[in-house]
Amino acid sequence: MYASYIEMRLKPGKMADAIEMAKQMEADLGQMGMKQFIIVDRGNDNSTVLALYDTAEDQEAAGPKSAEIVSRFMDVIAAPPDRKQVEVPINFTF
């Protein structure tokens, strides 16, 4: 399994707006080949996004659409997101 690991710094007080925007994009996100999409609110207007994919190829194929989706958040993010592509060696579901 592979993941896009994205750290985002939001403009002050914009976390709720970002979460609502992501909820409105559920259909678009579902068409990108990912298996899970997770937003973690780390407090202080910081968040981490995890987008999980079965294969590295699925993750790479989603790149252009991912960039387009991130651009929709430009009104709420304070700095360009830091995106890393990582491997997920363990993902237990209970």
What is the predicted role of each segment?
Residues M1-A67, D75-F94:
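Short S/T/G/P-rich N-terminal loop/turn motif that feeds into the first structured element of a domain
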